Amino acid sequence: MSVALKKFFSKRGQLSLEFSVLVLAVITAAILLGYHLIVSSKAVQESNIDTINNTHNTAIDALSEVS
């Protein structure tokens, strides 16, 4: 147990610990950004589908009045 603690508090171990915390922060930020991109793309997809449906319904109404 004390050997593991000595590795944590040595200069080389401290640099490794700082690097692992930095990598963890970068990975966490990438996960959050990816989640945000997926959620926002789903919202855009839904709004685009609604727009397409409204345009289609308007076109069908206009064409049904002509014939």
Curated annotation (Swiss-Prot):
Its main location: secreted. Keywords: Fimbrium, Glycoprotein, Secreted. Coiled coil: none annotated. Pfam families: Class_IIIsignal. GO terms for cellular component: cell surface; extracellular region; membrane. Disruption phenotype: Deletion of the gene leads to completely nonpiliated cells. The N-terminus is cleaved by the prepilin peptidase EppA, which recognizes the class III signal sequence. Induction: Expressed under standard laboratory conditions at 35 degrees Celsius. A motif (QXSXEXXXL) lies at residues 14-22. Minor component of the type IV-like pili. Essential for pili formation. This is Minor structural pilin EpdD.
